[in-house]
């Protein structure tokens, strides 16, 4: 039970589907409180609703910006950030501009992240690199840029692309960053075995929409 609680405290309980209903969001919030997940991660439109439910529970409120493509203006991402903070978000998962990164416009990527970090005023910033679209060398470069730009986490994927997390990807990221940087594994994580394996090789946080199933598996073992 104790180990299960420790693992629950590393999970961002997530529902980012465009067709998510209010009833589903309410259940997500209730489950997060029950299992003591680290946070709930929802689209910005749900922040106020979720915040009212989880207030005082110890569950953090996470949202996404520039999601899921990352291909919006920095000014748009900053606007989304400000509105998300206004509505209670304490953790922000932002998508980097994948196309610019592929074109090796690393300075633009870095400057955007720095602006987001500065405007976040100490709130947790996780930068999504969409590992399924990157080769090993690109994952290494992206990881270093994100750390140097002051973000708190490198996040593997949106869950809306062609690949999620793997232990191999976590190892690549881990070998590219210092011990001060953290990693969030996300995308296709649906079993307790996956969670345990990802944590073992260096993931600090898990993003999953199957968190309740994962916890039930852990508690049954």
Q: Where are the regions that the model predicts?
A:
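Short, surface-exposed connector motifs at secondary-structure boundaries
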Residues: 29-37, 123-125, 150-155, 177-181
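Short beta-strand/loop segments at the ligand-binding rim of alpha/beta enzyme cores
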Residues: 56-66, 120-132, 176-186
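Conserved N-terminal beta1-alpha1 strand-loop-helix module at the mouth
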Residues: 1-86, 139-141, 145-148
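Conserved anion-binding
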Residues: 76, 81, 91-151
